Amino acid sequence: MALNGEYAHVAFDELRAPLNKGKWRSDVFKADAAMPLDVEVGTGNGTYFAHHAKTHSDRLLVGLELKYKPLIQSIRRAVNAGCKNAAITRFHAFNIDHLFAEGEIDNVYIHFPDPWTSPKKPKNRFVCKENLELLFRLQKPGSFINFKTDSLVYFLWAMDEIRQSPYKIIFETQDLHNSDMKDQNFETAFEKIFLREGIKINFVRLQKI
């Protein structure tokens, strides 16, 4: 497996990844302790993952992805782009506190997670009050979370959860591509599909004050 072979130095399975907790900068990236460390929850095929790593070479990036094929696609894109600041792990985001120590991470990106729209499935949604409280402890003050989804049902539900969390809402829209944030936005592969189908993109930015 590439997780323990070709990409072993930048791709970690469920057993190896927690060993980096509190030590991602020093042990994985050999970077200065002050260098920002961002996290993408659910990298998909890695278009945003590689873009972020390449355009923000002054920041580190760790991706979380459960599915093996997109995980490898993601790290391969970053490596092929010459990025030395990206790593990825096959790990369930609900257990993200097993990967990072309190105050270890900076910005968090959550793009188009499964909306779990079945009436019995909201408990599986990652953006919820409990996980936001968890992320709040892991992030440095001043850091933000970007959350994008095509599902208005999930977005409205998540906004209720967000308002019960410690985060401050910096920007919120139900139509990202007709908002003041459109020029700052990078379109993911899923996003391009949704836009072609005429689906509006919901977006919120939260900040740890």
From Swiss-Prot:
Annotated EC: 2.1.1.33
Covalent S-S links between cysteines: none
Residues involved in substrate binding: D150, T188, A189, F190, E191
Recorded catalytic activity of this chain's protein: guanosine(46) in tRNA + S-adenosyl-L-methionine = N(7)-methylguanosine(46) in tRNA + S-adenosyl-L-homocysteine
GO MF term (any one): tRNA (guanine(46)-N7)-methyltransferase activity
Record bears the keyword NADP: no
Signal peptide (from-to): none
GO cellular component, one term: tRNA methyltransferase complex
Purpose: Catalyzes the formation of N(7)-methylguanine at position 46 (m7G46) in tRNA.
Name this protein carries in UniProt: tRNA (guanine-N(7)-)-methyltransferase
Lineage of origin: Bacteria, Pseudomonadati, Bdellovibrionota, Bdellovibrionia, Bdellovibrionales
Gene name, Swiss-Prot/TrEMBL: trmB
